[in-house]
Amino acid sequence: MSAQAPAPASRAARILITGAAGCVGQYTAEHLYRHSDAHLLLLLRDPSKLKAVPANDPRITLLVGDLRDLEPHAAAIASATRVIHTATAWGDPERAHQVNVVAVKRLLALLDPAVLEQVIYFSTASILNRQLELLPEAMAYGTEYIQTKAQCLQDLEVHPLAERIVAVFPTLVFGGRVVPGDPHPTSYLTAGVKEAFPWLWLAKWLRTDASFHFIHAADIATVCAHLATSPYRGN
């Protein structure tokens, strides 16, 4: 049976963002920095990549390290009232499993149920069918990224903190540096557009029954910030 979320208290919000140096992470951190009074705990591997928010601001605490080694930041993680988990990995199957499955379990274990109100977990729309159910093919035939995201979602559905977890399923994400001076890192999709541009003329010869859905990282940040700063009573 899932643990009940604590009623919102007068304590100041402390929002932990993993993958805080990434595209979605930085858009989200910036939105919360500008539009809330929450203290931000930013977990990231390379603080030099953080450009969207001032790292030395009193409202920001940098937790520098790898998601696979959270013990040095156990006390800070336990103080979080909300979590926005954007960090992920793909490419190497073992690394994907450690980051996308094992590290998520460890992160949840370090949270304090007496303090935690909500976890916003980033999955992917690629593992869902049209009825928003988990695709069996995701586990059977997916890439290491798809398989580990599907495995993690299954684990979260039966986790003791399940009632406090909100899963979001982004589609194809645009965002980042398209004009000089933009402080946000470029999403992988946006970065690929420049390389693909010389070949776009070939698209007129292609026909497909598939559909593609796009979203900008700034819009994802707005949604996540709204969720993370609104009263939450559990699923």
What is the meaning of each model-derived region?
Residues 10-38:
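N-terminal Rossmann NAD(P)H-binding glycine-rich loop of SDR-like oxidoreductase domains
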Residues 41, 102-147, 166:
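Conserved Rossmann-fold NAD(P)-dependent oxidoreductase catalytic core, especially the SDR/UDP-sugar
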Residues 97-101, 138-158, 210-218:
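Short-chain dehydrogenase/reductase
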